[in-house]
Amino acid sequence: MSFKSIFLTGGVVSSLGKGLTAASLALLLERQDLKVAMLKLDPYLNVDPGTMNPYEHGEVYVTDDGVETDLDLGHYHRFSSVQLSKYSTATSGQIYTKVLTKERNGEFLGSTVQVIPHVTNEIINVIQSCADHHKPDILIVEIGGTIGDIESLPFLEAVRQFRCEHPQDCLSIHMTYVPYLRAAKEIKTKPTQHSVQNLRSIGISPDVILCRSEAPLSTEVKRKISLFCNVPEHAVFNAIDLERSIYEMPLLLAKENISDFLLNKLGFSPKPLDLSDWQDLVEALCDKERQHVRIGLVGKYLEHKDAYKSVFESLFHASVPANCSLELVPIAPESEDLLEQLSQCDGCLIPGGFGTRSWEGKISAARYCRERNIPCFGICLGMQALVVEYARNVLDKPLANSMEINPETPDPVVCMMEGQDSVVKGGTMRLGAYPCRIAPGSLASAAYKTDLVQERHRHRYEVNPSYIERLEEHGLKIAGVCPLGELCEIVEIPNHRWMLGVQFHPEFLSKLAKPHPLFIEFIRAAKAYSLEKANHEHR
């Protein structure tokens, strides 16, 4: 086999941070001059997370080729330089759909279709296809769910078979939780022992056990885990809870020397690891002594911390080159004191979303920021809110609206895109990377410093082309359009400190090592506004 595979499973509890671990391992392996590919296998029966409630699943991350995926792929992107595509994700829903389609087409020649071998063979095909497409030195495969879940069994069986076929080219990492009982003042290893027993009963013996814990594990505890879980003591690693930032994870794993162990196990020769640049970025990110800036997030799903994961992370990325310390203030659009909360912020971000709930609150936030010259950034639905507010209060169209909110509006300044009226919701939006031509002399041009960019999209609605001329006559600047059909991509409010809306999702391209330019300029504008307010108060 031309590539090596690392399979990452989780046990004891969910939300262990497998995605962050996989992303951090990718960073460490890339620093060894190895090409890494990544694959997330999700056991749920949905075909993809595109139609799932953000409160249940969190953010939907979109790849360049237009695939709606799990938010863990966002972690992969932000930590490493791996290329992500439709080959980087698979769900049980996709697997079963493929198997049943083949059965209907007669490809199994009348055989009884079963989980083994037909479903497991399809899972193995997914693993092989990812490697064939991306051609990595090492493929990291994260298996969603927790050992013991019935949904994960076909994936684990496929991994067992794959390991049997390629025993020298595969390695299994099992991530577990090691709890600390405060009353007894003891660290308990029994849950880890049982989780490994479950995994071994399926036929997979882990090569590495990565223990998540509140505090560092002693040598004695590691020795006990080694003894009862049948792994060498030097193959038991510790991932303690991170106190400052998720971006400390690669530094923590590097300190544990886990990448050296993995490389030796897979037949590579480790090189000295230099993470000084990453360390500097983390220190800058966590520096609380910098200028304090408050950003209000006026969003629909703020109760779920993962619903806007990429937006949150992009703001923090931008705080490093902007040299400030961010405080993110969640503001419910339905709040009675919405405007009072906004008045205490240095900038406002209105993220994407769907549906009528909270729409008018976003309109109010946009108006407040426009009239009071507060930096404001609208993304996707947020941009549409900026345009509708402008039409209502500057064009004097009080009934202007989006057709998503009110299909009967007399002034549909935001309308459904042509061909988007399908009753099938999954995977039918305008998805993936499209070009955007930037207008010279605009805020966007100052940020991008180029006249053509590629950005990722996920939407059905657009600024109504029949209203664009009137909007421009009243001062709204169309700062970016898609050359493929002249779709409005970026709008800017004139004579304003910094107010910009984008139809795309710039948060999907931001990294700690390469923050997105629009987020940088937004945070810089908010910082300047914060300093201006502080100077005014001290006069």
Swiss-Prot record:
Allosterically activated by GTP, when glutamine is the substrate; GTP has no effect on the reaction when ammonia is the substrate. The allosteric effector GTP functions by stabilizing the protein conformation that binds the tetrahedral intermediate(s) formed during glutamine hydrolysis. Inhibited by the product CTP, via allosteric rather than competitive inhibition. Changing residue 405 to M: In strain: L2. Belongs to the CTP synthase family. CTP binds at residues 14, 149-151, 188-193, 224. Pathway: Pyrimidine metabolism; CTP biosynthesis via de novo pathway; CTP from UDP: step 2/2. One of its GO terms (biological process) is CTP biosynthetic process. GO terms for molecular function: ATP binding; CTP synthase activity; glutaminase activity; identical protein binding; metal ion binding. NCBIfam families: PRK05380.1, PyrG. It holds the Pfam family CTP_synth_N. InterPro entries: Class_I_gatase-like (IPR029062), CTP_synthase (IPR004468), CTP_synthase_N (IPR017456), GATASE (IPR017926), GATase1_CTP_Synthase (IPR033828), P-loop_NTPase (IPR027417). UTP binds at residues 14, 188-193, 224. Mg(2+) binds at residues 72, 142. It comes from Chlamydia trachomatis serovar D (strain ATCC VR-885 / DSM 19411 / UW-3/Cx). ATP binds at residues 15-20, 72, 242. Gene3D superfamilies: 3.40.50.880, P-loop containing nucleotide triphosphate hydrolases. L-glutamine binds at residues 55, 353, 381-384, 404, 460. Residues 294-532 form the Glutamine amidotransferase type-1 domain. It catalyses: UTP + L-glutamine + ATP + H2O = CTP + L-glutamate + ADP + phosphate + 2 H(+); L-glutamine + H2O = L-glutamate + NH4(+); UTP + NH4(+) + ATP = CTP + ADP + phosphate + 2 H(+). One of its GO terms (cellular component) is cytosol. This is CTP synthase.
